[in-house]
Swiss-Prot record:
Gene: apt
Top-rank EC class of the record's enzyme: transferase
Family the UniProt entry places it in: Belongs to the purine/pyrimidine phosphoribosyltransferase family.
Keyword Transferase assigned: yes
Keywords: Cytoplasm, Glycosyltransferase, Purine salvage, Transferase
Organism whose genome encodes this protein: Chlorobium chlorochromatii (strain CaD3)
Gene Ontology, cellular component aspect: cytoplasm
GO molecular function: adenine binding; adenine phosphoribosyltransferase activity; AMP binding
Cell compartments where the protein resides: Cytoplasm
Example of a GO biological process term: adenine salvage
Catalytic activity as recorded in UniProt: AMP + diphosphate = 5-phospho-alpha-D-ribose 1-diphosphate + adenine
Name of protein: Adenine phosphoribosyltransferase
């Protein structure tokens, strides 16, 4: 599947020493976007994984998670940056590859025991994914799996998530480049 070749690499963004993997070139291409959603849909249908809802991490996790929610017939729950959700929220701070941030989820976003597929575009340090998983768990959900378009194995996020007991699935890896 030619997904990797559709992802643009931008050196020294957002700061020097970071190689940014830009999926906008992938998702603006209707064939590339369809490949991503079709592949993920097929993977989860064939795996028979038991989950109730998809949680997408702002912002690119909304794009993939929303489309995947539609194709799989699942609800969608957003994890957002602070101040973007209108009702009561819980927050989680986290470290990322180039700084720190905070994310939030509505306190009533999930029903106790709901199984969640957590979706984002890219896995680097695992900080964002761990923070989102903590939010899911704070509001009563269970993370069934985490799905990403891009994994950067050299940065160590996948290893960190696996060590914490999370299942991880990604479409493509950028190793050593």
């Amino acid at each position: 599947m030619p997904i990797k070749s559709r992802i643009r690499s931008i050196p020294d963004y957002p700061k020097k020493g970071i190689m940014f993997r830009d999926i906008t070139t992938l998702i603006k291409d209707p064939v590339g976007f369809r490949l991503v959603i079709d592949h993920l849909t097929q993977h989860y249908l064939e795996a028979g994984m038991d989950f109730d809802v998809i949680v997408g991490i702002e912002a690119r996790g909304f794009i993939i998670g929303g489309a995947l929610s539609y194709t799989l017939g699942k609800g969608f729950v957003p994890v957002r940056k602070p101040g973007k959700l209108p009702a009561d929220v819980v927050s989680q701070e986290y470290e990322l590859e180039y700084g720190s941030d905070k994310i939030e989820i509505h306190t009533d976003a999930l029903v106790e025991g709901q199984r969640v597929l957590l979706v984002d575009d890219l896995l680097a340090t695992g900080g964002t994914a761990l923070a989102a998983a903590a939010l899911v768990e704070k509001v009563g959900g269970i993370v069934a799996e985490m799905a990403f378009i891009v994994n950067l194995p050299d940065v160590g996020g996948e290893r960190k998530l696996l060590e914490k007991g999370y299942n991880v699935y990604s479409l493509t890896d950028f190793e050593g480049d």
